[in-house]
Design a protein with these regions (language model features):
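Conserved catalytic core of nucleotide-sugar-dependent glycosyltransferases
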Residues: 125-187
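Edge beta-strands of extracellular beta-sandwich domains
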Residues: 324-325, 353-363
Length: 363
């Protein structure tokens, strides 16, 4: 990983997520010596900055006040770039603006692996390692083309389904600020945009298109939970995008990564869930380690000819009641702390608000 730099934007709210992301990547020896540059958005205090430096070896924090001064000089010849980064609403969606310019322009080696703080590397990222070693630029695959161009939308050509939560820019010839300027000439025309948080991603989708060398990571191994089925044994990287139902799953995946591999199975059962005169098999397995219970399921809707049907689990302990929503995901899991007393488990399908909670007999 010669001359690679990792760049990540961090804010106070997502500080722990950023640390989890880097730790999950650094479990792989290929990355554990790569320098990390944290770009702060002005929300971190001295204690936060010290925590980053102390927790992550070979890390540096680029403070906003320093970055603003340097980046302003870079963008002085590009009016749309300058307006986007420093305009009247410069503090709105600031994190996206920092990603657009600061990662690359403040890089020392110009070989940038850009990470969002809400990523988790759940297994060794073999594809990322290979592409970085081969100097091939890439981006994370999205479930849609989340862009926000103004009319006429087709005046700016783009690659489809670009997600910039994980990108690799291998060198100076792969970052073209003229392409970003061109995209922004549409995106912030008359200082109007209907979805400002997508501007940065839209601009990069155009830059990647104009470059012609950027490659999408394998969408079967790089997933967005809730919106996509996740096989945690086969997935390499997960992106917990800023959507409530996605973020609800985040802590379960962090716990899953910390769940001991030598855990033992304590429960296994298949029940039938009645829906629309059909009986849907629901397979459940439960594992335990010293501190946690791991519930894994298979929602066999396709076996009865159903393509999509949301479902939920509810866990009741003497201390709390928690609902886990899984959309139409056929495979999944959730992890809870082992309760001192009894535990009750319920399951239901969900169809346009209609539910039918049924208790599952448990140990």
């Amino acid at each position: 990983m010669e001359n690679i730099e990792i760049h990540m934007l961090v804010c106070k709210k997502d500080l722990s997520m950023g640390l989890n992301c880097i730790k999950s990547l650094f479990k792989n020896k290929e990355f554990d010596q790569v320098p990390v540059f944290f770009h702060e958005d002005g929300s971190l205090d001295a204690g936060d900055i010290e925590l980053l430096k102390k927790t992550i070896n070979n890390s540096f924090v680029i403070e906003k006040k320093y970055a603003d001064e340097i980046i302003r000089s870079y963008l002085s010849k590009y009016p749309f770039c300058e307006k986007y980064r420093f305009g009247k609403k410069s503090d709105i969606y600031l994190w996206h603006k920092i990603k657009t310019f600061d990662y690359f322009l403040l890089s020392k080696t110009k070989r940038v692996l850009g990470l969002d703080s809400d990523l988790l590397f759940v297994n060794k990222p073999e594809e990322v390692i290979h592409l970085v070693q081969e100097n091939i630029p890439f981006y994370f695959p999205d479930v849609q083309s989340a862009y926000s161009f103004n009319e006429p939308k087709n005046e700016i050509p783009v690659l489809e389904n670009v997600n910039t939560g994980l990108i690799f820019i291998p060198g100076e010839e792969y970052y073209n600020i003229e392409s970003i300027e061109n995209a922004l000439s549409n995106l912030i025309r008359d200082e109007i945009n209907y979805f400002p948080s997508w501007i940065e991603q839209s601009a990069f989708a155009h830059m990647f298109y104009m470059d012609g060398r950027y490659k999408s990571l394998n969408k079967s191994k790089n997933r967005i939970p809730f919106f996509q089925e996740v096989d945690i044994k086969k997935s390499e990287c997960l992106h917990f995008v800023s959507y409530p139902d996605v973020r609800k799953l985040y802590n379960s995946y962090v716990s899953k990564m910390n769940f001991k591999e030598n855990s033992k199975k304590i429960y296994e059962k298949t029940i039938e869930v009645e829906y629309d005169f059909k009986k849907i098999p629901l397979e459940i397995e439960t594992y335990e380690d010293d501190l946690f219970l791991n519930f894994e399921f298979k929602w066999c809707i396709e076996s009865v000819g159903i393509n999509a049907l949301s479902h939920q689990f509810k866990i009741k302990t003497p201390e709390e009641e928690t609902v886990y929503e899984f959309g139409s995901n056929k495979y999944g899991f959730f992890i809870i702390k082992k309760p001192v007393d009894k535990i009750e488990i319920y399951h239901t399908y969900e169809w346009y608000g209609k539910k039918d909670w049924r208790k599952i007999e448990f140990l």
